Amino acid sequence: MSSSTEIERNLELEILCKNIQCADKSKRQAALNELLQSVSKQSTDEDLKNLLDLTYLHLVKCYTDKFEAIRSLAISIVNEFLKCFQTRNEFFLDYIIPTMRRRIGLPEMVEESEEIQLELLTQLGHIVEKFQSNDTDTLMRIYNDIMDILVRNLTNRYANAHRECCKAIQLLATATPSFYMRAESLVDPLTELLCHRQSATRTIAVETLGVVCLYITNKNDKIVKSIVSISPLLTDSVAAVRRMCGIIGCKWLIELRDRYSFFERIVPLVLCCLKDDLVDIREEINTHFIRCGEQFFDENQQELQRIELIDHEYPCSNYVALVTKTRPTLGCRALVEKSLRMINIIVKEMLDWKEPVRLHSLKLLWEVVLFAEKAFTCKFIEVFPALAKACQDDENSVVKEAKRVAFLMGQLLNYNDWMEITMRDLKKFPNCLGILRCFNSLFAGAEIEHKRNSVEEIAKLISTSEMCHNLNEGYQSALLDLIEQMVNIHLTKIENESGEEKYLFEILVKTIALSNAHENNEIATRGLSLYETFCKTPENRVFLQGMHMTDVINDIEDLDCEHSERSERIIMLFGCIKLCGFQKEYFSSIQTAVKLVLENSTANAQIKILSGLSMAFLNWNHENMQGSAMNLLSIFIEDILEPVLIWKAGRNAESIRAMATQALCSIGCSCPDEAREIFPKLSKNLISLIEDELAVTRAYAIRCVLKAGPFLYEDYRHLVTEILSRLDDPCANVRCLAIECLPQLEVNPSDDMFSETGYSSLVEYIISRLFLYLDDPYIKIRPILLDSLAKLQKKHPVVFENEIKKLPTNYLYNDIIEDLKSARLE
């Protein structure tokens, strides 16, 4: 370049610099635009350096210009210088960084424009990137200025500034070896950004915090704070945030200093991502975690190689089908095994009051069990109480996940160890639904060979009154799940043990009996289906009942106390009677139990048991009685029913008498031969019941008379009188039964008190009274009345003809006479 050209160029630059300092904003702006174009036209670093030497003071001053456009242009010019320089120029470190600090790095933010703040932070990132070096620490002398800027702007109100700041931090970490000196000062502001409402900010904050922790030395509390702050983001609603948590966790497992001390806190970050809802996240994090395992294997090769020699088979036969993926590598499993101290944190979160936290911790526990396998057995005693509580949770999703975890434990853990602990807790807390559900899932996951040897021990414990006598619907459902498993195992055995069979039978009967407490019949339906499966055949069912029902009835304790109809003991007795009925072997046990209830319990409880007796008597099986039905029924009626049939004052007494009469009627329906012999002995009770206040009692009493055999003459007379009095009963059903009963009422002619004349007079009186009710307005009575008259005509033709002659001659009676004479009613 000629000297004249150079002089012209310098004059132009002097004019340009003068215009940059001009008071007129438009001139300053035009001059800066001209300078920007001039920078891009420089071809060499020497030319750029000369240009910069003439203009840098003016540019630095423009950083503080009162107009935002001027400040923005100055920043753009410096960026262009930075871009065009092939070599490093100390100007950026000596002048620009300190200027930045004064503008955006002080506690009181000088720069008011958010856009300029963002431009300055972006420029800071470019400068750091330009001056990064592996040889000389060029950034060392202005390191504190840069850190002041970064720390201050992490608390900026502007979200974009946060993200630019995080990018600059990541660049600075690799740009200077001195980054570790103040790295811990970034932890607190970065952890605050983890709660930012924008997901992009949360994501880059996690990434930056992960990088910063790699350079923290002798500040373990800061690393712990970082991990604890990141952990809640594992349940973030945005997938990118969760993914970054897993990536940082894997990065820490590989690169973090003293990482072995933090394994129990870092590993959960990775394992939680392995249970993420998105397949892409699970696959990506799994790839990273495999590399972590490989590094851990290499670092502990001598120890793990010995394990590798014997660790080539799956721990259980259906392992792959269970977890739907291949078995984790030995390095990953060893890494998790070394981190089992994390269980303390997981257990604490399993007891948290927030449902998402409990669910999240259970998913994490599932992964820990999967990787730790048998090594987790040593932690089972710590986890089991919290897992049992989770199984009793109000949230169905939590219960479902807790049962999955328990099932996996049953698959992978040492059977004898967890069985000993759970059996101990079942005995200690016999009515705990959570423990029962947890045990059920554990047992379901265990190998069939182990379970076969434990069925009798478990069934013996479950059959006790403390465990089995529970009215809770959820508890009964869980109990049925466990029983179903044990029954299926029992049925696969070639030789069934008698003790095991006895306990399983008792549990099934008790559970079905107690299901009567609920309106929902699902439990009863399941129980009955399982009961039929267990018994196999009706004959075997009868045999099992005869063998074991005495013990079931005797297990119902404290029946000599006052119980209501909702008492577990009353419901149990009612259900047993209803399900199994009567057999000779346990007839006396039922009789004793029912007697205690009728003597001590409330009226409603007595009514419930009597209704159960009615249903049982309707299903009476003579084959089960082995020819002793007459004797057993006589004793039962005399000892149990007859005292209840005696009249007592009060509404409760009326209801009890009604149910007792119904039970007596059921005997008459199912045991007609026995009833013909037994019922005549109850004539005095029946006479009293026929005039009872309750219509239903009167109806059942007359039905009992219909089933009875010949009565003694005096009893017959009183019965005729009482039944005839029921022809005027306010209840039409009672009137119909009375009319039906009169022709069927029998007298014993061999009785010493029997008188033929008196008997004929009674028959005449019966027939004459029946004729009087032919005009009853109740439409159903007339055919019953005519049928009864026809039976009396056939049974006593002479007396009947004499009574017809006494009838008045009118159209009603003439029609009846004609019908009877023509035998159309026979």
Q: Where do the PLM segments sit?
A:
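Extended, low-complexity, acidic/polar intrinsically disordered regions
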Residues: M1-E826
